[in-house]
């Protein structure tokens, strides 16, 4: 009887979480319809994050949720104003079942993998975004990827990440998966126009490729922004 009671308590908590996510989405949609989404005050909304790009033209609003079946859900709004007098363009991305993003390929509102974006750096033709994701309990993911904006089309990913100094092999984004017990830091250095971040290694050489056992090894890597990004450099 006690186990049955605990089960129903768990179901209630999960259903409440799903309902809260739906209410949050409806409330944000309502606010954006009633006022300028570029300036809308969302500070009273719990768990809803908002970041502005370094050029002040792109606002990103996002939050996440754990669904009743254990999957991770992500909600994201890109709000773009090329000029201050322009009406903002709003594009909503949702992922009801987050998945590990692929290094190669592009994503849009119809096939997005799901993450929280916490920094946007203006580059030629768009932005370079930093994202954070949980798609399973045993690992965490950090992402560096381009956002291209063309009218009302918002596309994530572009083949600008050089895998080698030759520049012959390119990827669409940088994806770093590591242990859920570890912390990986990525910072942007505007003067050098580069991202600097922890180098990840398995806790044991025999665990190579099993990213849930990866973590910082107290060395650092860098990706420099130029015509293309990279190649990866140890610093």
Summary of predicted features, one role per range:
Residues 20-78:
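Start-of-domain marker
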Residues 74-82, 143-151, 211-226:
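Beta-propeller blade signature
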Residues 1-27:
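Bacterial Sec-dependent N-terminal signal peptides
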Residues 57-63, 126-133, 193-199:
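Short beta-strand elements that form the blades of beta-propeller/WD-repeat-like
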Residues 128-129, 134-154:
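Mid-length scaffold segments of soluble, non-membrane domains
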Residues 105-107, 112-121, 135, 155-222:
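Short aromatic loop motif centered on NTY/YTY
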